Amino acid sequence: FQEDKMGKNIFAIAVLAGLTFAGLPVQVLAQPVEVGIQDYKYNPPEIKVKVGTTVKWVNNEKRASHSILFTGPGGFESDRIFPGESWQRVFDKPGTYVYTCGPHPEMKGKIEVTE
């Protein structure tokens, strides 16, 4: 009889705990927004994302390596991204980020980051 009563108490506590946390928001980690690199192009070449978004560039070329070179104020260039590799960055400030490929400046991309 004691075990049965204890089991009911544990069940009641579990139900109450579930109801307590049921109304709380759950933060879901968003998947990165992916930009492919193939045929010496960024695909898509222009994207719009919210502050806090991670953008991931994936090199789908067979032989060529590329980089992501941000050309605006405080410009920055990623390490080389070899075929089959990727590089990512979190955009934590709103603005327009224009980039090219360091070794292939004809490759152009743009990211619009909004609140």
Annotate each PLM feature.
Residues 8-14:
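Sec-dependent signal peptide recognition
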Residues 7, 18, 23-115:
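Extracytoplasmic copper-binding redox domains, predominantly the cupredoxin/blue-copper superfamily
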